[in-house]
């Protein structure tokens, strides 16, 4: 009886994907008011829901993915040496470059094409870029004792489970919803999708 009560109380603080996504506004890790509409930051404008407003649900998902990614990056970077930090930065630069390619591909819409399809494709493409980068960060962090320790603490010793969810997402062309939902339900992230570490 006491065990059941304890489990019930633990789950009270946990969220779900639905609770995260259906908030009025989901803010990414960066300040949207500072992003310029100059054609160079369209990936960030989409995450901020300034581009593709008809695609708000998917844009919110991108903001959640952005928060998870930046939170993981910041937490594991604190214990990383210069070489590993350099590797982490390279992973981030690659991910940002991939995000920008996703937006460029969206802008190549053909006349008569359903206008929502390019937005959905861009969102899927950007989620894939985040999934790849998250997986690469985790795999690189596991190769170093200090960052591996932090990674295990962040994921409460379930790193393999979350690597598998990311791999499944990439192998099945699914979005990050299951990954985010699992993080939320296991109380690893807060209401902004930042790790509670």
Which positions does each model-derived feature cover?
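N-terminal alpha-helical modules
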Residues: 15-197
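Classical Sec-dependent N-terminal signal peptides that target proteins to the secretory pathway
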Residues: 1-16
């Amino acid at each position: 009886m006491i065990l059941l009560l304890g489990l019930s109380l633990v789950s009270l603080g946990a969220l779900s994907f639905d609770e995260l996504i259906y908030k009025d506004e989901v803010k990414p890790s960066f300040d949207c008011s500072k992003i310029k509409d100059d054609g160079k930051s369209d990936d960030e404008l989409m995450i901020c829901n300034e581009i593709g407003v008809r695609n708000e649900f998917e844009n919110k998902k991108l903001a959640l993915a952005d928060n998870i990614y930046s939170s993981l990056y910041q937490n594991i970077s604190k214990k990383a040496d210069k070489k590993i930090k350099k590797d982490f930065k390279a992973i981030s630069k690659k991910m940002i470059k991939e995000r920008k390619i996703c937006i460029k591909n969206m802008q190549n819409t053909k006349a008569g094409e359903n206008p929502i399809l390019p937005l959905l494709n861009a969102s899927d493409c950007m989620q894939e870029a985040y999934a790849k980068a998250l997986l690469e960060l985790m795999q690189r962090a596991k190769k170093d004792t200090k960052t591996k320790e932090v990674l295990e603490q962040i994921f409460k010793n379930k790193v393999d489970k979350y690597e598998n969810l990311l791999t499944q997402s990439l192998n099945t062309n699914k979005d990050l919803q299951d990954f985010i939902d699992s993080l939320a339900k296991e109380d690893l992230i807060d209401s902004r999708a930042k790790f509670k570490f």
